[in-house]
Design a protein with these regions (language model features):
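RNase H-like, Mg2+-dependent phosphodiesterase core
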Residues: 1-185
Length: 185
């Protein structure tokens, strides 16, 4: 018996639909660091405004090897119309709670992107139904959005790579804590 592994890649159909409805700046948002016991939560935000900015092998960061994520990160940050990330510390997570910390990280990432493009994002597509809406933005929260939609997948890669790099840096500074083991999601 032969078995096959089907690899699902996200598409840009939602982004294209929103562009056709007049939304020029469509931002994907996702986070990394919601589950681990140590470290910050990081949100990534990616905007593409043409299909030639798509990195073909990008998909949900959880489905990629570290090497492929790093390669994808390099290409995403080079090709995208704009990208950004927001970091909320472990201390702030403890103070705010994880839901508010994720919202804060996403708001920071969004602000970074808006500063880069010089205008307000028209529409947000974000991974997950259990996140809070960002006030005063049109926003779709999509279950498994990081599997389905390119901008969200690219944002998941940005968030994951930035967070992993931080955790590896913490591990070098504080080797007794094993921070390199807290690079989960």
């Amino acid at each position: 018996m032969v078995s096959y592994i089907m690899i699902i890649y996200p598409d840009t159909k939602l982004e294209e639909k929103l562009w056709s409805q007049g939304y020029q700046i469509v931002a994907g948002l996702d986070e990394a660091g919601r589950g681990p016991l140590a470290g910050p939560v990081v949100a990534g935000c990616v905007v593409i405004n043409s299909l030639d900015q798509v990195v073909p092998f990008v998909r949900d960061s959880k489905k990629m090897t570290k090497k492929k994520r790093e390669e994808a990160f390099s290409l995403i940050t080079e090709r995208s119309f704009a990208f950004g990330y927001g970091i909320v510390s472990a201390a702030d997570i403890d103070r705010l709670g994880i839901q508010k910390a994720v919202l804060e990280a996403m708001s920071i990432a969004l602000q970074v992107v808006e500063e880069k493009v010089g205008k307000r994002v028209d529409y947000i597509i974000a991974d997950g139904m259990n996140i809070s809406s960002i006030p005063n933005y049109k926003m779709d929260k999509i279950t498994q959005g990081d599997l389905l939609h390119y901008s969200i997948s690219a944002s998941s890669v940005v968030a994951k790579v930035v967070r992993d790099r931080l955790m590896y840096d913490y591990a070098k500074k504080y080797p007794l804590y094993g921070f390199e083991k807290h690079v989960g999601y």
